[in-house]
A protein has these predicted regions:
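Beta-strand-turn-beta hairpins that frame and shape the catalytic cleft
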Residues: 1-5, 163-174, 206-212
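Residue-level marker for buried hydrophobic side chains located in beta-strands
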Residues: 5-7, 33-35, 213
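Short catalytic-loop micro-motif centered on adjacent basic/acidic residues
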Residues: 5-9, 135-136
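Short, flexible loop segments at the rims of nucleotide/cofactor-binding pockets, characterized by
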Residues: 8-13, 110-115, 187-190
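Core catalytic region of metal-dependent phosphoesterases/phosphodiesterases
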Residues: 15-167
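His/acidic metal-ligating clusters that form di-metal
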Residues: 29, 103, 116, 127-130, ...
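Short, structured patches in soluble enzyme cores that scaffold and shape functional sites
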Residues: 138, 174-176
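A short secondary-structure junction signal
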Residues: 146-149, 182-187
Length: 214
């Protein structure tokens, strides 16, 4: 029996990429979906209230003046399609945030996890009745708290550090950890630690020759 697996990685918070990934299973006749890592985006984009229905948004160094609800909705979609997180705020809060990096970090985490939760719900709706599951291991850019959200899903399986038995009969090991980077990301470690991480998973495989190393 032939098994088709669709693999993608590094979607970095983009709603468009997540939805295309979920749709790819049916389009390509895949039996299972694997997302390799780096699910989440890298920045919050402030939507600064200017009074009434008006907001000012700076996206990729371009300033947009929003003047009505339809424009606001479209700009949110545009920001999300690029993997950033829209955050409605006001000039007073912006002044406070400029002096409080911890609060900025908290807002970023809040928005990231909110979107990951939305993605889990989208996956459950799109893949209901298909028999397909998503096997996912967050990457080095993804905060640890992402794992907790994925664990609650009935459709998206957290594969990090596990030996997963796929419906095809193959075993799969998976990890989103990387070697050291200049950016001190969430999941990185020295080469010998990475080797130990993979050796621990490999030692649990029944048939390494027919296994998937993700």
């Amino acid at each position: 029996m032939t098994t088709t697996i669709f693999f993608a990685t590094d979607i970095h918070g983009s709603d468009i990429c997540w939805n295309k990934f979920l749709n790819a299973g049916k389009f390509y006749g895949a039996d299972q979906l694997i997302l390799g890592g780096d699910m989440t985006g890298k920045a919050v984009v402030p939507f600064i209230h200017q009074g009434g229905p008006n907001y000012r948004v700076t996206l990729l160094e371009q300033v947009f003046e929003i003047t009505n609800e339809d424009e606001l909705t479209e700009m949110k979609k545009k920001v999300r399609s690029r993997g950033y997180y829209p955050y409605l705020t006001n000039p007073d809060e912006i002044k406070e945030l400029e002096k409080d990096p911890e609060k900025v970090s908290a807002i970023f985490s809040q928005e990231v996890l909110k979107v990951v939760q939305q993605w889990m719900e989208i996956a459950e709706k799109k893949l209901a009745g298909t028999g397909m599951k998503v096997y996912c291991c967050p990457g080095n850019d993804d905060m640890d708290e992402v794992d907790d959200v994925i664990r609650e899903s009935r459709t998206v399986v957290l594969a990090e550090g596990e030996v997963v038995d796929l419906p095809s009969g193959h075993e799969m090991i998976a990890s989103g950890w990387s070697n050291r980077t200049p950016w001190n990301t969430h999941r990185e470690e020295d080469e010998d630690q990475l080797a130990a991480r993979y050796e621990a998973m490999i030692s649990r495989l029944k048939n390494p020759q027919a296994s998937i190393f993700n």
